[in-house]
Amino acid sequence: MSSQFDQLKLWSVLVGDTGDPALIKTLGVQDATTNPSLILKVAQEPKYQSMLTEAISWGIRQNGDDVQTLTFVLDKIQVNLGLEILKHVPGRVSLEIDARLSFNTEAMVQRAIFLSQLFEKMGGDKKRLLVKIPGTWEGICAAEVLESQGIACNVTLIFNLVQAIAAAKAKVTLVSPFVGRIYDWWIAAYGAEGYSIEADPGVASVANIYSYYKKFDIPTQIMAASFRTKEQVLALAGCDFLTISPKLLEELKKDQQPVERKLSVEEAKKLDIQPVELSESVFRFLMNEDAMATEKLAEGIRIFSGDTQILESAVTEFIRQIAAQEA
């Protein structure tokens, strides 16, 4: 019997949820995805200091003001890591724009264009890049503009079906619903000791999005993310993409128990699902009605924003040191 890892690959594209290029090459996955938290972790490792130093030197040479230089450096760090990761996966890498722009459509568009252009300028294939955009209304509007300009987007921090429907309407390439964070909220909110996999609210959320998309032949891809357990991963066998931490990937490789496909287009087509007519006001109302989605979206933005600020502080100190050496 083949491993659960190999069995899952029959129905789903497996994605490495890490920003560490050295780790990625050991995982045997198709794609990779990063976020500010993962990039911060990698940037703090001694073995990647040369990559960080190169990005800082490059940013300084662009002759911008202090704010612009910091922006240049942060995006160059992402691109450096992304290009290194792509040496070890055959598919795509997802790079994320600054979470502090989450409610500014124009700023997100401009930053994503800059990131995409820098990626190409440094030798990257644009077809192998997904720009991660937060699943706010403003973010989804930005993704719509970017997709129309040929920049593929991964709309992330998806916690409610309405976000996924809005992203589909915007014709985005891919959405990332967060299984584990939904599960965490329900545990914390209701004091439950846990949910069976059949009743797992995070698994159910992704399954609902999958069913809606496949029922109505929506081409936007679904990449389930933020898994807490191997059982959650297996419960979504058949989802388009599964982005999985290195720890859980290793667990899947070691287990040879049979895996059953849980999601399929054929089964989704049989479901009685009504299409949702969506507008900005409907989007905002339905998000407001969902305390979990509202809170987890806000929390996700805060976490990514906070990690970006920590990374900025580290980069600012490096810039100061380099400037002092050159003085």
UniProtKB/Swiss-Prot annotation:
Pfam families: TAL_FSA (PF00923)
GO biological process: carbohydrate metabolic process; pentose-phosphate shunt
UniProt cross-references to Gene3D superfamilies, sorted A to Z: Aldolase class I
Biochemical pathway: Carbohydrate degradation; pentose phosphate pathway; D-glyceraldehyde 3-phosphate and beta-D-fructose 6-phosphate from D-ribose 5-phosphate and D-xylulose 5-phosphate (non-oxidative stage): step 2/3
Keyword Membrane attached: no
Recorded catalytic activity of this chain's protein: D-sedoheptulose 7-phosphate + D-glyceraldehyde 3-phosphate = D-erythrose 4-phosphate + beta-D-fructose 6-phosphate
Cytoplasm as UniProt keyword: yes
GO molecular function: transaldolase activity
Enzyme class: transferase
Any one annotated GO CC term: cytoplasm
Residues at the catalytic site: 132
Compartmental location: Cytoplasm
Entry similarity comment: Belongs to the transaldolase family. Type 1 subfamily.
Record function comment: Transaldolase is important for the balance of metabolites in the pentose-phosphate pathway.
Protein known as: Transaldolase
Upper classification of the organism: Bacteria, Pseudomonadati, Chlamydiota, Chlamydiia, Chlamydiales
